[in-house]
Amino acid sequence: MMLHKKPVLLLLPIALVIFIVFWVSNRPEKISYNRDIRPIVNNKCISCHGGVKQSGGFSLLFEEEAKRPSESGKLAIVPGDSRNSEIIKRLNHSDTSLRMPLDKEPLTKEEIQLISDWIDQGAEWEEHWAYIPPDPDITPPQTVYSDLTENEIDRFIFAKLEEMGLAPSAKAEKELLLRRLHLDLTGLPPSKQDYENFLADQDPGAYEKAVDRLLSSSAFGEKWASMWLDLARYADSKGYEKDLHREIWKYRDWVIQAFNKDMSFEQFTIEQLAGDLLPNASVSQLIATAFHRNTMANDEGGTHDEEFRVAAVLERVATTFEVWQGTTMACVQCHSHTYDPIRHEEFYQVMAIFNNTADKDLYNEQPKLVTYAEEDKPKIEAVIDYLQTVAPSVPVEAGDGFLYDKAENLLNSLDYRKVSAAEFQDKSSFIELVAHDQKSIWQVQDSSWIMFEAVDLTDVQALSFGYASLYGAILEIRLDEPLGPKIGEVKLGVTAKGFPGNKPEQWRTVKAPIQEVEGKRNLFIYFRKDRHYTQDLLRLDWIFYHQKNPKYLALGHQFTQKLKLLEQVSPEETQILS
C-alpha cells in the first residue's frame, strides 16, 4: 500500500507548481491608469462626469472625487473590489436607462474588463502624463544606420524608420542643404553670393560655419521672433470695434533682440512676466512686460472700463498657460479643467497675481514707458545737463535710459508743468483720442468731461489750454467730480473750418484763472456748448499749470531755447505692465 501512495505524494507538489504557473501566466499585467484607463475615461465618460458636469455627483476628473460616495451614497470605485464597484455594475447593466454611458454606445467587453482589472489591482491613480518629467536616462536605441548617426537624436529617428520599414534618404546636395538651412533659420533664400561662397568652401566644417553665420544674422531673430509674437498676440492695433493704432513696436524689437542675443529662456520668461518687479528694472526689462499689454482695448463709446480691464486680466491668465504650459486655461474660468489636473479655484489664484496692474482699458493705454530714439538721446542729455545746473537737486529714478522721466522731474522742479490732454485718468462716454496720433482728444460733446487724478494745485493760479475748434465751446474747471465745485471757466473761440487741428495755424492758446486750491485734488475739465450744438465741440491738445512766481521765469531766454529743443524731439511710447 505504501508503494501506491508515494507516486501520489510526488504528484501533489508538481500539480501545485503547474497551478501557480498557470495562475501567474493568466493574471492580467499591471494596468496603467494613464496608458489604459484615462483614454477610455476621456473618450466616453468625462463629458458627463468631469469638470463641466458631475452627473449623479460622480466625477472622474480627480482621484478624491472618483473614490468618494456619489449622490446615491454608493462608491463607484472600490479599490481592490470590482464586483462591489458601482461603476462596473452600471457599465454592465441590462437596463439601458441605467447603463452607462447613458444614451450612448456601451463600452466594449474589453474596455469594461480593463476597468474591472484596474480596480481589482487597487485602482491606482497616476499623475497626468503631461506633467510627469521625462526620464533623462533613456538609452537611445540601436540601429542598423549607426554609421549615419551624428547625434543621439538621429538614433531615435533611424530606429523609427526601421520599425516602419523605411530607409533614410540620401544626403542632400550642398546647394539644397544651404537652401534648407537659410529657410529654416532666417526664412530667406540664400543669395547668389551665399551659394558661391558655400560651394567654394571645401572645409569639412563648411556647413557648421554657415549655421554660425546665419545664427548671428539679424534675420534669424526676425524670423523666429515672428513665431513668438504670434503667441504674444502682437498687433499694431487695439482690436474690437475701432481697432485703432497701437504704439508697441518696441516690444517687437525687444523679442527680436532677445533671440539674436541668445537670451536664456528662463530670463526671457522672467522679463516678460515680471520685468517690472525686478530690482532696478532697466528700460529693456520694462519693455519686455509689454507681452501682456497686447491684450485688446475697447475704445467704443459707452464701454465700461472695469469690464474690459477684467477681461484683459482673464485673458492674461489664459495666455500665460497656453504659451508656457501648452494647455488651455480659459475653460477653468468657469469649471475645473476637463482633461488637465487644474482646479476651478486655481484659475482665480493665478488671476490674483495678475489682478494688480495699473492699466484700466483707457484710451491713452497708460501706463506707458516713454523713451527716446538712440540718435536723439545726446540732444536730450545736453538739455538735462543744462537743467541740472540751474534746477535744484531733485531725487530722480534715472537708471538705464530713463531720460524722459528725468527731464520731466527737472522741469517740474522749475515749476514748468505742461501735460498732454490725452493723459486723462478716466473718460466720459463720448471723448476719444484722435485716431491717427492718439495725442490729443476730440469728439468732445456737450456735458462731456475728462478727469486728472490727484493733481497738486497748490500755488496754481491759472490753467492754459492748447485747442482747435469749429464752433467754440465753454470749458469749466471743477474739483472732485464732473459737476463739483467750479474754480474756473473760459470761453473757447472758433479757430478752424473743417476738421480742427489739421494745420498749425488752427491751434490757439487760452488762459483761465482759477481760485486758490491747496493740496492734491481730482481735477475735472467739463465741456459745454456755446451758441451752436455739434457732435464735436473742439480738439484739446495740452494743459499748462501756471504757478505763482515759477522758477523757470528767472532763467529767461536761454531756458526758452533749451525748452524748444526739448519739445522738438518726439519721444517714443510703449505700453508696459506696472
Q: Where do the PLM segments sit?
A:
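N-terminal export/targeting leaders of redox proteins
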Residues: 1-35, 235, 254-255, 259-261, ...
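Short, structured secondary-structure elements
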Residues: 21-25, 60, 95-98, 102-104, ...
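Local sequence-structure signature of Cys/Sec-based thiol-disulfide redox active-site neighborhoods
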Residues: 30-47, 54-60, 320-328, 340
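C-terminal capping alpha-helices of c-type cytochrome domains
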Residues: 31-33, 103-125, 364-397, 523, ...
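Extracytoplasmic
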Residues: 392-566
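Coiled-coil termination/hinge junctions
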Residues: 562-563, 567-578
